[in-house]
Amino acid sequence: MRSRTGCLTCRQRKLKCDEKKPVCRQCAKASRECIPSPGIVFRHQQNASMNGEDSTAEKSLKGFYAYKNTFDKDAMWVDIPKCITFVTTTNLYLDSGVLELDTMLATSMESPKPFEPHCLASWRTQGDRHPIGNVPSSLRSELAPSSVSCCLTQDVKALSPQIHSSPGSVIERPVSPPMSLFNPHIGLIMNLTTSSAMPSTDSFFSLPFDSTDYMPRPVSRPRLRWRPPRPNASILTQDEHEIACLLQWFSEGPGYWMDLFITGTYFASHVPVEAVENPLLKYAIAACAAKAFARVQDQKPAMGGSSTRQAGMKHYPNVPLVDWEHKTAVYYNTTVSMLLQALNGKVASSPNGSKCELRQRNGDPACAYNVSAPKPRRISQNTSFVPSTEELLVVIAILCFYEFLDTSISEWEKHLHGAKSFLVLSQQHIRSLRLPNLASPMFPTSSKFASKAWRAVFWNIARQDMLAAFINKTSTRLDTDDLTLWREAGLILDEQACIMPSNAAVYGYLEEGDAMIKEELICNTLVWLMVKLVNFMAVGSVIPSRSGAAWDGVVHRTRFCQWFSLRKQFQVWHEGLPVTFRPSARVAPSHTSGQVSNDDSASMFSEAWHSMPMCASTMQTYYMSQILLFMNKPHESTLECHTELIRMSYHQSVLAACQIHSRRIIGISLAQPDKAVRVHSVQPLFTAGQCLSDNRECQIVLRLLRDIESDTGWATDYRVQQLVEQWQRNEPDSQALWSDSRCAIPHENKYPSPTFNTVRLQHGSDLRSN
């Protein structure tokens, strides 16, 4: 019989539970989530249904134990041995009993046999009987992540039925029925880890067995996760077709954009593969792809394919009639709900009290550390997996990019705050694994201890954090003084926390024989410098005002030293660039005038094309940094007096230097780089537009920004609006020129336009182009 213990919710609140399904009365009354209890105790000697035929009235069990609803009327019965040996395993991966079970599983999967449930009717005998639970198809995914338990091994000669199938039955894929039906040994494995979900046991022991869908899996795999059967592409359902379309769109669109500064493709290639088995990743990808798809819809494929004929997976039926915004909201809400539930079971209360579970995967322990939950928890009815820390990081990065698509400031900041906290927490666990007394190859001291997934997520979050701080005129969340964190991400710094030249072999920028492409490291180094520059700009606008020339002198001298230090590091970075960061082709303005028919003003700029997209985008960011650096140079002295002529000459020289960098930013965009470069060029183009005064040049910047949003769906209208308002303030007479260029901002937030301090350069050498 079952020992009724009540649901977990009532047990935690110390309430009496009536165990009503699916929600007990106490939980329904208080509007709480009713979580069934996984604890089941079998006491067959106390059940009246176990009385044998020869049992007398004195020996038989009384009516007190004869529960009417102990077993269902349709329960199936099979003979089991009276003597059962329970074996307690301490190591699931090395225990001989489990290894033997794996062999049996492999044998049964290699030679599947047809199976029909109605054949079990002939197995019922008059001896001792016990009902065997059957696994319903709806609970197969919930039973997958189990890991611990008891093995039953006993010779059973009675289980040798003749298994046959009807002639008309068709088996579409290999099916393995329960092990007890094919082997003389019963191998019952019920696994339960402290970080996995326990399925509902009531339905587990009552629902009929779906033999056509059930397939047992080996339990000795390093990562205990259920692998769903691969469906036939010809019988995809509508939802599966939609998911397939969104997965491919993400790989060619947002995922490819996130991989711009990564050698190879991680988000575009590896993450969709993981999403096949990870519902959390799948819904996150679907939400991001649906949002991007809703903003472009009737466009040709993002990359590859044909514009005249598309694959069936890409062609979604009735695209104009589909409410993609609603689908985006559904996928997003599902992802956030699953993410919060996963985080509640993953993150410990404090770094000192947290537990770190080290699971070796592919020989690299750094790839698979997990923060274990304090107690078993059922995540949800549709969640049958325990996501790893890396998978949670990837999901958070995708959600941040989801908000970055249309620059939803409030939600974007929330995700960035969570991403920063989770990155730091995971990095602390990486640090804790580096024990000083473990001098072995498994615990290296280099930054390679961090996994590729962690690095890919870190640099994506670092770029978004820098851009969010630039847009909102605030400081970044990531601390540039935490050198250990940045070194974990691969940044090469010397003892003085300064960058090293990328082409100086004496500094060991790349280890000998290392196959890593250094362009990725160079691009990431510029992100670190940009973070320092944005923080420098944010601090300069909030300096507390104190009376006294002495205090003002200290503040200005300190900021002046910081500015020169930043300028020196940018110069070191630029002087060490390899040839790959130079334009592979450049077209002078005189050669482009005859080719442009509709927009003759485009011939005012030289076009520069880079063969490596990451280098093109990085150079645009560098030119943007030089503009910001010049415009935020502090005064050398607050008491120094200059004539108006010198001041005017100085401002003109600064504007000329900034316009040189602005034209280079525009020239790279005019060369029509791929969409990944274009979506990352919004902020450089906006910065360049602030330095322009010619109406024709301004029109080009507006056209480039609008084309980015129309072609990719990336939000640029808020920057267009800010540029138009700024140009109207500078030239009130030109309001008619920009009247047709104004566009409404669909966001509720008003984005602050960066304001820069007036700068002064000492001599003309500061104005040279870097």
From Swiss-Prot:
Per the record, the major location class is nucleus
Inducing stimuli: Expression is up-regulated more than 10 fold in toxin producing cultures.
| Gene (name only) | AMTR1
Query: Where, subcellularly, is it found?
Result: Nucleus
Q: Beyond the main fields, what else does the record say?
A: Gene clusters encoding host-selective toxins (HSTs) are localized on conditionally dispensable chromosomes (CDCs), also called supernumerary chromosomes, where they are present in multiple copies. The CDCs are not essential for saprophytic growth but controls host-selective pathogenicity.
What is the name listed in the Swiss-Prot or TrEMBL entry for this protein? Transcription activator AMTR1
Answer yes or no on keyword Metal-binding.
yes
One cellular component GO annotation, for this chain's record? nucleus
- Entry keyword set: DNA-binding, Metal-binding, Nucleus, Transcription, Transcription regulation, Virulence, Zinc
GO terms (BP aspect): positive regulation of transcription by RNA polymerase II
Q: Does the keyword Ribosomal protein apply?
A: no
Purpose of the protein? Transcription factor that regulates the expression of the gene clusters that mediate the biosynthesis of AM-toxins, host-selective toxins (HSTs) causing Alternaria blotch on apple, a worldwide distributed disease. AM-toxins have two target sites for affecting susceptible apple cells; they cause invagination of the plasma membrane and electrolyte loss and chloroplast disorganization.
- Lineage, highest ranks first: Eukaryota, Fungi, Dikarya, Ascomycota, Pezizomycotina
Q: Whereabouts does the entry annotate DNA binding, in residue ranges?
A: 7-34
Q: Name one GO molecular function term.
A: transcription cis-regulatory region binding
Q: Which PROSITE patterns match?
A: ZN2_CY6_FUNGAL_1, ZN2_CY6_FUNGAL_2
Q: Which InterPro entries match?
A: Fun_TF, Zn2-C6_fun-type_DNA-bd_sf, Zn2Cys6_DnaBD
